[in-house]
């Protein structure tokens, strides 16, 4: 395991730096590192690392979402209002509709299989989007209209919506029925996730005021609580018979947002600590995403797979455009939002192989498209954000 970690960090840093020098997204270098080191290429990563890959990726997500919360001003979100809610489900819904319309014509699959494929591909990646938006907040680009905050908030809920749809479509393909209780879990996951985060944020705020603790120790406390919140998601859902859900990741983000509101100076210091943790977490996250990608599948889809990815992205962009109707955003800012809301990585790496493991006839092509979505949209989206934000957003 130690050798595998050394390879992940050293090779990831070197290749990431090379790509940065070539003016390409460093995360592309990290994903390629994972593909090369992973089980489908050189197979240099120990099974002990691969077996906990999902947990390590979740750990990295916890770090970046906590940092997002620590930089998320609630007042900014209040100003945005309606579009923030629409961005949580409209773009993903449009992308799934696009998949249902186009995929059966290109790959001779059923409408239901196309819907399942759409639910795998539709989730935006907070791991790609959030660090870029935090950079925009630091540099004061788009902050006068709360654009980074809008996109970060939408991305955190978008995943919940898509995963519930994925569960429902999986049940239908298996020959079962859609449980309407699954859809009740969407609002309850959001509401109870936010409430739990606010309550814990309030308790931590009082605790940190009463007891003098080093900032490093505060980070350890917050991280530990975050791990517990994410771990008990399934247990809480089962406790209430699957009717009530709770989003641990949304609760984690809410803790950070509450600390930002109640103790702004502390939140700035903690954000700095988390940004240092993200240096290592980012490498682990994207290298392991790459390791989960079977590059051989990507070649199986050919040109049609690439055409499909770009076609459904157009549908997604139309969904973003619709969500931003009657806002104060100008044409350039809307274009930026459409571009920024495209990258995919973490959810696709996590659920892309599930239909194949369940023995679905469409399982292989769904995995192929999930792999392509990661390889195309994660680096391309990160690159597009990087080269366009100074041209399309106003500097405050």
Regions found by a protein language model. Name each.
Residues 1-8, 49-66, 111-126, 185-197, ...:
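Structural signature of hydrophobic alpha-helical transmembrane segments
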Residues 5-17, 157, 163, 167-269, ...:
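Core mid-bundle transmembrane helix pairs that form the ion/substrate translocation pathway
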Residues 11-22, 66-79, 129-142, 200-212, ...:
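C-terminal ends of transmembrane helices
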Residues 14-18, 124, 160, 190-199, ...:
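Hydrophobic transmembrane alpha-helical segments of multi-pass transport and channel proteins
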Residues 31-38, 53-80, 96, 169-174, ...:
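Hydrophobic transmembrane alpha-helices of secondary-active transporters
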Residues 74-142, 295-393:
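Transmembrane alpha-helices that form the ion-translocation and gating core
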Residues 97-102, 160-168, 227-244, 285-298, ...:
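Hydrophobic alpha-helical transmembrane segments in multi-pass integral membrane proteins
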Residues 140-157, 161, 180-184, 269, ...:
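Membrane-interface alpha-helices at helix entry/exit sites of multi-pass transporters
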């Amino acid at each position: 395991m130690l050798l595998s970690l050394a390879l992940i960090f050293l090779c990831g840093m070197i290749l990431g730096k090379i790509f940065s020098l070539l003016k390409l997204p460093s995360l592309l270098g990290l994903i390629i590192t994972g593909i090369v080191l992973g089980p489908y290429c050189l197979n240099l990563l120990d099974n002990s690392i691969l077996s906990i890959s999902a947990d390590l990726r979740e750990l990295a997500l916890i770090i970046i979402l906590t940092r997002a919360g620590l930089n998320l001003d609630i007042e900014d979100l209040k100003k945005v209002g309606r579009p923030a809610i629409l961005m949580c489900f409209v773009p993903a819904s449009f992308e799934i509709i696009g998949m249902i319309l186009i995929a059966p014509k290109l790959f001779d699959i059923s409408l239901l299989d196309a819907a399942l494929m759409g639910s795998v591909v539709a989730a935006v990646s907070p791991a790609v989007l959030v660090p870029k938006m935090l950079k925009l907040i630091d540099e004061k680009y788009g902050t006068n209209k709360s654009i980074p905050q809008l996109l970060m908030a939408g991305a955190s809920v978008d995943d919940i919506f898509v995963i519930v749809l994925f569960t429902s479509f999986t049940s239908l393909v298996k020959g079962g029925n859609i449980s309407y209780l699954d859809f009740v879990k969407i609002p309850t996951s959001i509401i109870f996730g936010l409430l739990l985060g606010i309550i814990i944020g309030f308790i931590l705020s009082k605790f940190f005021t009463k007891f003098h603790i080093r900032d490093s120790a505060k980070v350890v406390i917050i991280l530990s609580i975050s791990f517990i919140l994410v771990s008990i998601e399934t247990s809480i859902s089962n406790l209430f018979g699957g009717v009530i859900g709770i989003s641990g990741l949304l609760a984690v983000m809410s803790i950070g947002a509450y600390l930002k509101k109640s103790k702004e100076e502390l939140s700035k210091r903690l954000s700095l600590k988390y940004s240092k943790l993200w240096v290592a977490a980012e490498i682990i996250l994207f290298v392991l995403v790459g390791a989960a990608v079977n590059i051989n599948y990507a070649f199986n889809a050919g040109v049609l797979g690439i055409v499909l990815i770009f076609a459904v992205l157009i549908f997604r962009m139309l969904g973003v455009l619709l969500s931003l109707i009657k806002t104060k955003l100008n044409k350039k800012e809307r274009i930026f939002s459409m571009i920024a809301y495209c990258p995919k990585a973490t959810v696709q790496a996590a659920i892309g192989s599930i239909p194949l493991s369940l023995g679905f006839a469409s399982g292989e092509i769904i995995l192929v498209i999930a792999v392509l979505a990661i390889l195309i949209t994660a680096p391309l989206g990160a690159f597009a954000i990087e080269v366009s934000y100074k041209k399309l957003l106003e500097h405050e």
